Amino acid sequence: MTLSKITSIAGLLASASLVAGHGFVSGIVADGKYYGGYLVNQYPYMSNPPDTIAWSTTATDLGFVDGTGYQSPDIICHRDAKNGKLTATVAAGSQIEFQWTTWPESHHGPLITYLAPCNGDCATVDKTTLKFVKIAAQGLIDGSNPPGVWADDEMIANNNTATVTIPASYAPGNYVLRHEIIALHSAGNLNGAQNYPQCFNIQITGGGSAQGSGTAGTSLYKNTDPGIKFDIYSDLSGGYPIPGPALFNA
Protein backbone atom coordinates (compact mmCIF):
# COMPACT_ATOMS: atom_id res chain seq x y z
CA MET A 1 0.00 0.00 0.00
CA THR A 2 1.37 3.41 -0.95
CA LEU A 3 2.08 6.13 1.59
CA SER A 4 -0.55 8.38 0.00
CA LYS A 5 -3.21 5.69 0.43
CA ILE A 6 -2.20 5.12 4.04
CA THR A 7 -2.40 8.87 4.69
CA SER A 8 -5.80 9.06 3.01
CA ILE A 9 -7.18 6.17 5.07
CA ALA A 10 -5.81 7.69 8.26
CA GLY A 11 -7.54 10.96 7.44
CA LEU A 12 -10.85 9.22 6.81
CA LEU A 13 -10.58 7.31 10.08
CA ALA A 14 -9.82 10.52 11.96
CA SER A 15 -12.84 12.23 10.38
CA ALA A 16 -15.05 9.26 11.23
CA SER A 17 -13.81 9.37 14.81
CA LEU A 18 -14.67 13.05 15.10
CA VAL A 19 -18.17 12.52 13.69
CA ALA A 20 -18.77 9.49 15.89
CA GLY A 21 -17.99 11.63 18.92
CA HIS A 22 -21.03 13.84 18.34
CA GLY A 23 -24.14 12.68 20.14
CA PHE A 24 -27.91 12.83 20.00
CA VAL A 25 -30.72 12.25 22.48
CA SER A 26 -31.48 8.53 22.46
CA GLY A 27 -34.44 8.90 24.81
CA ILE A 28 -36.05 10.91 27.57
CA VAL A 29 -37.50 10.10 30.97
CA ALA A 30 -40.71 12.02 31.74
CA ASP A 31 -42.55 11.52 35.03
CA GLY A 32 -40.41 8.45 35.60
CA LYS A 33 -41.34 6.81 32.28
CA TYR A 34 -38.80 6.18 29.54
CA TYR A 35 -39.56 7.15 25.94
CA GLY A 36 -37.22 6.16 23.15
CA GLY A 37 -35.92 8.87 20.85
CA TYR A 38 -35.18 8.91 17.14
CA LEU A 39 -32.03 6.82 16.70
CA VAL A 40 -30.51 8.70 13.79
CA ASN A 41 -27.68 6.19 13.54
CA GLN A 42 -30.18 3.36 12.91
CA TYR A 43 -33.71 4.39 11.93
CA PRO A 44 -32.93 6.16 8.61
CA TYR A 45 -31.59 2.85 7.31
CA MET A 46 -34.68 0.84 8.28
CA SER A 47 -37.61 0.25 5.92
CA ASN A 48 -40.11 0.49 8.76
CA PRO A 49 -38.63 2.35 11.74
CA PRO A 50 -40.69 2.54 14.94
CA ASP A 51 -42.81 5.56 15.74
CA THR A 52 -41.36 7.74 18.49
CA ILE A 53 -42.06 10.94 20.38
CA ALA A 54 -38.94 12.41 18.78
CA TRP A 55 -38.82 14.25 15.48
CA SER A 56 -36.86 12.41 12.81
CA THR A 57 -33.89 14.00 11.06
CA THR A 58 -31.57 13.25 8.17
CA ALA A 59 -28.45 14.22 10.15
CA THR A 60 -26.98 10.73 9.88
CA ASP A 61 -23.49 12.22 10.08
CA LEU A 62 -24.39 13.33 13.63
CA GLY A 63 -23.62 16.82 12.41
CA PHE A 64 -24.92 20.26 13.22
CA VAL A 65 -26.63 23.39 11.95
CA ASP A 66 -24.36 26.44 11.86
CA GLY A 67 -25.03 30.14 11.46
CA THR A 68 -25.64 29.83 7.73
CA GLY A 69 -28.77 27.83 8.58
CA TYR A 70 -30.29 30.00 11.29
CA GLN A 71 -33.01 31.30 8.96
CA SER A 72 -33.62 27.81 7.55
CA PRO A 73 -36.24 25.39 8.92
CA ASP A 74 -33.33 23.05 9.70
CA ILE A 75 -32.55 25.05 12.85
CA ILE A 76 -35.99 24.27 14.28
CA CYS A 77 -35.63 20.52 14.96
CA HIS A 78 -32.46 19.68 12.97
CA ARG A 79 -31.97 18.84 9.30
CA ASP A 80 -35.12 17.97 7.33
CA ALA A 81 -36.90 17.19 10.60
CA LYS A 82 -40.27 15.45 10.42
CA ASN A 83 -42.89 15.27 13.16
CA GLY A 84 -42.72 12.62 15.83
CA LYS A 85 -45.83 10.42 15.77
CA LEU A 86 -46.14 9.69 19.49
CA THR A 87 -46.47 11.89 22.58
CA ALA A 88 -44.99 11.71 26.07
CA THR A 89 -47.12 12.83 29.00
CA VAL A 90 -45.54 15.01 31.67
CA ALA A 91 -47.03 16.93 34.59
CA ALA A 92 -46.31 20.63 34.92
CA GLY A 93 -43.67 21.14 37.60
CA SER A 94 -42.05 17.75 37.01
CA GLN A 95 -38.68 16.94 35.47
CA ILE A 96 -37.59 15.55 32.12
CA GLU A 97 -34.25 13.82 31.63
CA PHE A 98 -32.58 14.00 28.23
CA GLN A 99 -30.27 11.05 27.69
CA TRP A 100 -27.51 11.93 25.24
CA THR A 101 -25.58 9.06 23.65
CA THR A 102 -22.21 10.77 24.09
CA TRP A 103 -20.61 14.18 23.78
CA PRO A 104 -17.03 15.31 22.97
CA GLU A 105 -15.32 16.97 25.91
CA SER A 106 -13.87 19.60 23.57
CA HIS A 107 -17.31 20.76 22.35
CA HIS A 108 -18.02 23.18 25.20
CA GLY A 109 -21.22 25.18 25.23
CA PRO A 110 -24.68 25.87 26.63
CA LEU A 111 -27.71 23.61 26.92
CA ILE A 112 -30.98 25.37 26.08
CA THR A 113 -34.54 24.02 26.19
CA TYR A 114 -37.71 25.50 24.67
CA LEU A 115 -41.44 24.77 24.56
CA ALA A 116 -43.77 25.57 21.64
CA PRO A 117 -47.54 24.98 21.77
CA CYS A 118 -48.87 22.89 18.88
CA ASN A 119 -52.42 24.25 19.22
CA GLY A 120 -53.60 20.81 18.17
CA ASP A 121 -51.80 17.60 17.27
CA CYS A 122 -48.00 17.86 17.36
CA ALA A 123 -47.82 14.91 14.95
CA THR A 124 -49.19 17.11 12.18
CA VAL A 125 -48.19 20.66 13.16
CA ASP A 126 -46.21 22.74 10.65
CA LYS A 127 -42.87 23.30 12.37
CA THR A 128 -42.48 26.74 10.78
CA THR A 129 -45.56 27.94 12.70
CA LEU A 130 -44.19 26.92 16.11
CA LYS A 131 -43.36 29.71 18.58
CA PHE A 132 -40.71 28.72 21.10
CA VAL A 133 -40.37 29.89 24.70
CA LYS A 134 -37.07 29.32 26.48
CA ILE A 135 -37.81 27.42 29.71
CA ALA A 136 -34.29 26.39 30.74
CA ALA A 137 -30.74 27.46 29.93
CA GLN A 138 -27.33 26.86 31.39
CA GLY A 139 -24.07 28.15 29.95
CA LEU A 140 -20.70 28.94 31.49
CA ILE A 141 -20.31 27.42 34.96
CA ASP A 142 -16.70 28.35 35.71
CA GLY A 143 -14.68 30.68 33.50
CA SER A 144 -11.60 30.99 35.68
CA ASN A 145 -9.51 28.83 33.36
CA PRO A 146 -10.41 29.10 29.65
CA PRO A 147 -11.98 27.37 27.83
CA GLY A 148 -13.88 26.99 31.10
CA VAL A 149 -16.40 24.56 32.52
CA TRP A 150 -19.72 24.56 30.70
CA ALA A 151 -23.20 23.08 30.91
CA ASP A 152 -22.21 20.28 28.55
CA ASP A 153 -19.36 19.32 30.89
CA GLU A 154 -21.86 18.95 33.71
CA MET A 155 -24.09 16.88 31.43
CA ILE A 156 -21.18 14.57 30.54
CA ALA A 157 -20.31 14.16 34.23
CA ASN A 158 -23.95 13.24 34.91
CA ASN A 159 -23.76 10.16 32.69
CA ASN A 160 -24.56 12.21 29.55
CA THR A 161 -27.91 13.25 31.05
CA ALA A 162 -29.44 16.72 31.22
CA THR A 163 -32.42 17.43 33.49
CA VAL A 164 -35.00 20.15 32.88
CA THR A 165 -38.07 21.13 34.91
CA ILE A 166 -41.33 21.93 33.14
CA PRO A 167 -42.58 25.19 34.71
CA ALA A 168 -45.33 24.47 37.25
CA SER A 169 -47.37 27.41 35.95
CA TYR A 170 -47.37 26.24 32.34
CA ALA A 171 -50.74 25.66 30.68
CA PRO A 172 -51.79 22.09 29.87
CA GLY A 173 -51.72 21.04 26.24
CA ASN A 174 -49.62 19.60 23.45
CA TYR A 175 -46.14 21.03 22.93
CA VAL A 176 -42.97 20.51 20.97
CA LEU A 177 -40.07 20.35 23.41
CA ARG A 178 -36.87 21.61 21.76
CA HIS A 179 -33.59 20.77 23.51
CA GLU A 180 -30.16 21.64 22.12
CA ILE A 181 -26.47 21.92 22.76
CA ILE A 182 -24.59 24.75 21.07
CA ALA A 183 -20.93 23.77 20.68
CA LEU A 184 -18.66 26.81 20.86
CA HIS A 185 -15.19 25.34 20.27
CA SER A 186 -15.00 27.12 16.88
CA ALA A 187 -17.38 29.97 17.69
CA GLY A 188 -14.67 32.62 17.72
CA ASN A 189 -15.18 32.58 13.96
CA LEU A 190 -18.34 33.75 12.21
CA ASN A 191 -20.65 30.75 11.65
CA GLY A 192 -18.36 28.64 13.83
CA ALA A 193 -20.99 27.82 16.47
CA GLN A 194 -22.58 24.39 16.04
CA ASN A 195 -26.24 23.83 17.00
CA TYR A 196 -27.53 20.32 17.73
CA PRO A 197 -31.32 20.74 18.15
CA GLN A 198 -33.52 17.79 19.20
CA CYS A 199 -37.34 17.88 19.30
CA PHE A 200 -39.97 15.81 21.12
CA ASN A 201 -43.75 15.81 21.37
CA ILE A 202 -45.10 16.14 24.90
CA GLN A 203 -48.47 16.67 26.54
CA ILE A 204 -48.37 18.79 29.68
CA THR A 205 -50.98 17.99 32.30
CA GLY A 206 -52.03 20.04 35.32
CA GLY A 207 -50.29 23.38 35.62
CA GLY A 208 -51.73 26.84 35.26
CA SER A 209 -52.41 29.15 32.33
CA ALA A 210 -48.97 30.56 31.45
CA GLN A 211 -47.43 30.04 28.03
CA GLY A 212 -45.31 32.98 26.94
CA SER A 213 -45.42 34.71 23.56
CA GLY A 214 -42.73 32.65 21.86
CA THR A 215 -40.34 33.11 18.95
CA ALA A 216 -40.25 31.33 15.61
CA GLY A 217 -37.44 28.79 15.36
CA THR A 218 -35.93 30.64 12.42
CA SER A 219 -35.71 33.81 14.53
CA LEU A 220 -34.10 32.35 17.66
CA TYR A 221 -30.53 33.24 16.71
CA LYS A 222 -28.38 35.43 14.49
CA ASN A 223 -24.84 34.43 13.59
CA THR A 224 -23.55 37.67 15.12
CA ASP A 225 -25.30 37.29 18.50
CA PRO A 226 -22.83 37.75 21.38
CA GLY A 227 -23.50 34.21 22.64
CA ILE A 228 -23.14 32.70 19.16
CA LYS A 229 -19.96 34.39 17.96
CA PHE A 230 -17.96 33.86 21.13
CA ASP A 231 -14.33 32.94 21.78
CA ILE A 232 -14.17 30.43 24.64
CA TYR A 233 -10.36 30.53 24.61
CA SER A 234 -10.21 34.22 25.56
CA ASP A 235 -10.72 35.90 28.94
CA LEU A 236 -14.04 34.60 30.32
CA SER A 237 -14.19 36.81 33.39
CA GLY A 238 -17.06 38.77 31.83
CA GLY A 239 -19.24 35.67 31.69
CA TYR A 240 -21.23 34.30 28.80
CA PRO A 241 -24.46 35.76 27.33
CA ILE A 242 -26.76 32.83 26.58
CA PRO A 243 -28.24 33.40 23.11
CA GLY A 244 -31.90 33.37 22.17
CA PRO A 245 -34.96 35.06 23.66
CA ALA A 246 -35.36 35.81 27.35
CA LEU A 247 -35.87 32.97 29.82
CA PHE A 248 -39.50 32.29 30.76
CA ASN A 249 -40.40 33.65 34.17
CA ALA A 250 -43.98 33.17 35.31
UniProtKB/Swiss-Prot annotation:
Disulfide bonds join C77-C199, C118-C122. Lignocellulose is the most abundant polymeric composite on Earth and is a recalcitrant but promising renewable substrate for industrial biotechnology applications. Together with cellobiose dehydrogenases (CDHs) an enzymatic system capable of oxidative cellulose cleavage is formed, which increases the efficiency of cellulases and put LPMOs at focus of biofuel research. It is an enzyme of class 1 (oxidoreductase). Optimum temperature is 60 degrees Celsius. This is AA9 family lytic polysaccharide monooxygenase B. Its EC number is 1.14.99.56. Lytic polysaccharide monooxygenase (LPMO) that depolymerizes crystalline and amorphous polysaccharides via the oxidation of scissile alpha- or beta-(1-4)-glycosidic bonds, yielding C1 and C4 oxidation products. Catalysis by LPMOs requires the reduction of the active-site copper from Cu(II) to Cu(I) by a reducing agent and H(2)O(2) or O(2) as a cosubstrate. Shows activity on phosphoric acid swollen cellulose, on NaOH pretreated soy spent flakes as well as on crystalline cellulose (Avicel). Does not have a positive effect on cel6A activity, but acts synergistically with endoglucanase egl7. Its cofactor is Cu(2+). Cu(2+) binds at H22, H107, Y196. Glycans are attached at N159. GO terms for biological process: cellulose catabolic process. GO terms for molecular function: monooxygenase activity. The gene is AA9_B.
